[in-house]
Amino acid sequence: MNKSLMVTKRDGTQEQINLDKIHRVITWAAEGLDNVSVSQVELRSHIQFYEGIRTSDIHETIIKAAADLISKDSPDYQYLAARLAIFHLRKKAYGHFDPPRLYDHVKKLVRMEKYDQALLDDYTREEWDTMDGFIDHWRDMTFSYAAVKQLEGKYLVQNRVTGEIYESAQFLYLLVSASLFSKYPKETRLDYVKRFYDATSTFKISLPTPIMAGVRTPTRQFSSCVLIECDDSLDSINATASAIVKYVSQRAGIGINAGAIRALGSEIRGGEAFHTGCIPFYKYFQTAVKSCSQGGVRGGAATLYYPIWHLEAENLLVLKNNRGVEDNRVRHMDYGVQLNKLMYQRLIKGSEITLFSPSDVPGLYEAFFADQDKFEELYVKYEQDPTIRKRTVKAVEIFSLLMQERASTGRIYIQNVDHCNTHSPFDPQVAPVRQSNLCLEIALPTKPLQHINDENGEIALCTLSAFNLGKIENLDELEELADLAVRSLDALLDYQDYPVVAAKRSSLARRSLGIGVINYAYYLAKNGVRYSDGSANDLTHRTFEAIQYYLLKASMNLAKEQGACEYFNETTYAKGILPIDTYKKDLDSLTQEPLHYDWESLRKDIQEFGLRNSTLTALMPSETSSQISNATNGIEPPRGHVSIKASKDGILKQVVPEYENLMDNYELLWDIPSNDGYLHLVGIMQKFVDQAISANTNYDPKRFEDGKVPMKVLLKDLLTAYKYGLKTLYYQNTRDGAEDVQEDLDDGCAGGACKI
C-alpha cells in the first residue's frame, strides 16, 4: 500500500493518508466479534484507494469491504460493517463521533424546522436533561449492517435532496417516545418515555416506517393502512378517487372496495344509458393510485376487492395477467376476491355459481357481509327468478380460473368475508367488514363516501406495531409490552392529522390498532419446534393467547383511565363476546392446549369498563422493520440462512438470528414439504387475532409431476385455509429456480405502509 498517497479531508484540505488511523478504527469496530479479520477488511479496501480520495470515500470503501465479507461462516462482519457505518453516520450528522446533548440537539433541529416545535413547548429544559440520561448511545452498536442502511435510507431525519443527515438512531427512538407521551400527566410521562424508549431501542417493540420516519417532525401523518369503500354512483366513484389521491400522497397503502359497482350493460336512469361496467372505473382508480410518486421512488399501491359472484367476475379475474390488450387489463393494482361458505359449498358439491350485477339483486350485496343465512336465502331466490339478468358457471371452473390467476400473478388475494364477520370484534348488523387493506391483515368496517367531505362515509385507518418474539424470554413480559404498545399507538391517534373527515371521525371513534409479531421463525427455532410437523402448534396457541389477552387487558385498563372508545357499543366485545367464543372449532383437532389466562374476569371487566380500542391485533408483513431489529420477517419462514435484499440503498445481506447455534433448527421456506403445517399455525393464530393475518401460500413446482402444481393441490390449500378459519390469503409464492436468498425489498407495499 502506498503510504504517500494524498487524501482530501472533509474541509477540502489535503494530507498524507494515515493508515494507522484506519487500522485503529477497524480494530475498534472488530472488538468482541467472532471470526472477523481486520487485515482482510484493510486488504480489500486498500486496493480501492487512489490519489486525492476524499476521507468520506475512504470510510465508505472500508464499510463496503466489511459488508462484502458477510456470510454464513462469518456472520459477525454484519456488526463490524454496522459499527463502521454508525461511526461514519455520526461524523456526517455531528462532525464527530460523540452525539451532542439532547436538549442542544432538539433546539437546533427545531430551529432548522426539521423537528416539531411542540417538542420544546411540551417539555421543560430540566425534563430534556432527565431524558438525556435515559439514552444509551451504545445501543447503536447492536444494529446489523442491513439495519444501519435502512435507518439511513428510510428513517433518520434528513434532507432527501442533498443527502444531509441530522440525527442518529437513539435520538430517533427517544424523540418518538417523547412525542407520543407528551400529553400524559407530568408526574408519569417521563416514566412512560423511558420505558417505551427502552422497549423500542432494544427491539422488543417494532414500529412501522411512517412512525419511525415521521413522529418528531412537523408532518403528522402516520396512517399505515387506509380502507376506502366505493358505492355504485358517479359521485361516490369520484369521491373514492379523490380520497385515494390524498392518501397515496401521504405514503399510505390503499385497500379499495369496488364490489358494489354495477356490471357492464346495466341500465342507467331507467335505460336511457348503457353502463360501461367495472373495468373503466378500475382504470380510473389505478390512475389515482399511481398519480403521486412517494419521494420520487414509485407510485402508490392498492388492492381492489370484489365478490366472486359479480356478473363480470370472469373478466375481472384476468385483469392482472400478461395476456389481453390494454383495454381489458388493469395490471398495476392487486386484487382481493371475496368468497364465503356458500361459494365453497357449491365448489365441493360440484355444482354451479350464479353471477349477478349487485344493482339487479336488492339486499344481496349487503347480506354477503352482514348475514350469511339471509345471503343464501336471497341468492337462491334470485337464481330462480327468470326476470333477473344472470350468468351461470360451473363452480369448479370459476374457482380454477381464480387459482390459476393467483398462481400466475402471485397477487390475486383471497378474503373469506363470512369469517371476517363471524369471528370479528365488530357486530356485523351495525358495522360489517366489507373489505381488507393493501396487505390483507386489516378487517375494519367502512362506509362509502358520496362526496369527499361526506361525514357519513367511513374510511378506515389502522395504526400498526409489533412484538419481537425473539426478544421475549417469558410470556409474562408481554404484559408490560402490551401496555406500552397500546398506550403509544392510542396516543398517536390523537397526535396525528387527518386529511379526510370521513377518516378522522371513524379513527377517533373506533381507535382501531393492529399489533402483530416479527421474528416468529427465530422464535420457533429457539424453542426447537418446526412449521411443518405440528410441533409448534401448542407453543403458538400459548403465545397468541398471551398476546391477545394482555392487549385486551391493556386496552381495558386504558378505558378505565381515559374512557372507552366512542363506538365501543358497535363491537362484539361490548356484548361480552371474546375471540375464544367465536373461533372455528375445527382448530381443536390441531391443538389440545388449554387456555392459561383468566378470560372470564377479563370478560367482566370489559363489560364494566369497556375497551379504549375496537381492535388490537393484526399480523402484517414486516420486511423493513425486521431488518432494523435483525429479525425474521413477520410469521414467515426464511428463504435462506443469509438473505440478500435489494433496495435502493444497495444490496443488503442479513444472517438469521443466532445462526451458529440454531442453523439446524431453522426450517427454510423451500424445505417445507407442503402448506399444511403453516396454514394450521396461521389458523391457531387467527383463533386469537381479532383482525386478519397476511398469510402466504408457497409452491415449489419441482415437487410435482411434470414440474406443474396441480389445480387440486391449489384448491385443497384454499379449502384448508377456509376450514381453519383464515380470514385472508396474501401472496402466492412460486419457486422459480432463481437464487432463493435474493429478495426485492420494495415489493409494492407503499412506503412500507401496511407492513412494518
Curated annotation (Swiss-Prot):
Residue ranges constituting the ATP-cone domain according to the UniProt record: 5-95
Known catalytic reactions: a 2'-deoxyribonucleoside 5'-diphosphate + [thioredoxin]-disulfide + H2O = a ribonucleoside 5'-diphosphate + [thioredoxin]-dithiol
GO biological process: deoxyribonucleotide biosynthetic process
Residues annotated to bind GDP: 209, 437, 441, 623-625
Residues binding dTTP: 232-234, 262, 269
Positions of the record's site feature: Interacts with thioredoxin/glutaredoxin: 749, 754
Top-level class of the enzyme under EC nomenclature: oxidoreductase
UniProt-annotated catalytic positions: 437 (proton acceptor), 439 (cysteine radical intermediate), 441 (proton acceptor)
Pfam families: ATP-cone (PF03477), Ribonuc_red_lgC (PF02867), Ribonuc_red_lgN (PF00317)
Keywords: Allosteric enzyme, ATP-binding, Deoxyribonucleotide synthesis, Disulfide bond, Nucleotide-binding, Oxidoreductase
Site note Important for electron transfer, residues: 730-731
Cysteines joined through disulfide linkages: 225-462
Modes of activity regulation: Under complex allosteric control mediated by deoxynucleoside triphosphates and ATP binding to separate specificity and activation sites on the alpha subunit. The type of nucleotide bound at the specificity site determines substrate preference. It seems probable that ATP makes the enzyme reduce CDP and UDP, dGTP favors ADP reduction and dTTP favors GDP reduction. Stimulated by ATP and inhibited by dATP binding to the activity site.
GO molecular function, one term: ATP binding
EC number: 1.17.4.1
Residue sites binding ATP per the record: 9, 15-21, 55, 91
Recorded GO CC terms: ribonucleoside-diphosphate reductase complex
Sites marked Important for hydrogen atom transfer: 225, 462
Function text: Provides the precursors necessary for DNA synthesis. Catalyzes the biosynthesis of deoxyribonucleotides from the corresponding ribonucleotides.
Family named by the database record: Belongs to the ribonucleoside diphosphate reductase large chain family.
PANTHER family: RIBONUCLEOSIDE-DIPHOSPHATE REDUCTASE LARGE CHAIN, RIBONUCLEOSIDE-DIPHOSPHATE REDUCTASE LARGE SUBUNIT
Assembly notes: Tetramer of two alpha and two beta subunits.
Protein name: Ribonucleoside-diphosphate reductase subunit alpha
Organism encoding this protein: Haemophilus influenzae (strain ATCC 51907 / DSM 11121 / KW20 / Rd)
Taxonomic lineage from the root: Bacteria, Pseudomonadati, Pseudomonadota, Gammaproteobacteria, Pasteurellales
